[in-house]
């Protein structure tokens, strides 16, 4: 029996990162966490490319453009959608989630969901490096594992 499982050491792999600028205070913390994880797992600076987009809604399109180039072994999507007093949150978070999943399935490149969808700013801050860890860091570790796993299969 053969079992496939990605490891967490990155050698010679390239990573694209897409970051939403809206709620930049949170996005920049997620990006810092992702970069920290990538570097700790052996990724060199010249193996990372970052694209900033206006907001979370634009993330799937740029992620798809990056994935279709086949330059990247994985694409990491980072940002924050924080609930307000209107239904806007529901529409944006739903479409971003579906869009990122579809990019991964359509391109067969791991596209990792590191977009926070929270009820308030406090929850976002907790998930961007305080009480609840850094979801950007976690997304980058997932990207490494998935890039390695797909290269094995």
Curated annotation (Swiss-Prot):
Q: Does the keyword Transmembrane apply?
A: no
Pfam families in alphabetical order: DMRL_synthase
In which pathway is this protein known to take part?
Cofactor biosynthesis; riboflavin biosynthesis; riboflavin from 2-hydroxy-3-oxobutyl phosphate and 5-amino-6-(D-ribitylamino)uracil: step 1/2
Which residues hold 5-amino-6-(D-ribitylamino)uracil? 22, 56-58, 80-82, 113
**Which residues are responsible for catalysis?**
88
Amino acids binding (2S)-2-hydroxy-3-oxobutyl phosphate: 85-86, 127
- Name the GO terms of the biological process aspect: riboflavin biosynthetic process
Q: What is its EC number?
A: 2.5.1.78
Gene3D superfamilies associated with the record: Lumazine/riboflavin synthase
Task: List the SUPFAM superfamilies.
Answer: Lumazine synthase
**Recorded GO MF terms:** 6,7-dimethyl-8-ribityllumazine synthase activity
Q: Which UniProt keywords apply?
A: Riboflavin biosynthesis, Transferase
| Catalyzed reactions per annotation | (2S)-2-hydroxy-3-oxobutyl phosphate + 5-amino-6-(D-ribitylamino)uracil = 6,7-dimethyl-8-(1-D-ribityl)lumazine + phosphate + 2 H2O + H(+)
Function, as annotated, reads: Catalyzes the formation of 6,7-dimethyl-8-ribityllumazine by condensation of 5-amino-6-(D-ribitylamino)uracil with 3,4-dihydroxy-2-butanone 4-phosphate. This is the penultimate step in the biosynthesis of riboflavin.
What the record says about family reads: Belongs to the DMRL synthase family.
Q: What name goes with this protein?
A: 6,7-dimethyl-8-ribityllumazine synthase
> What is this protein's gene name?
ribH
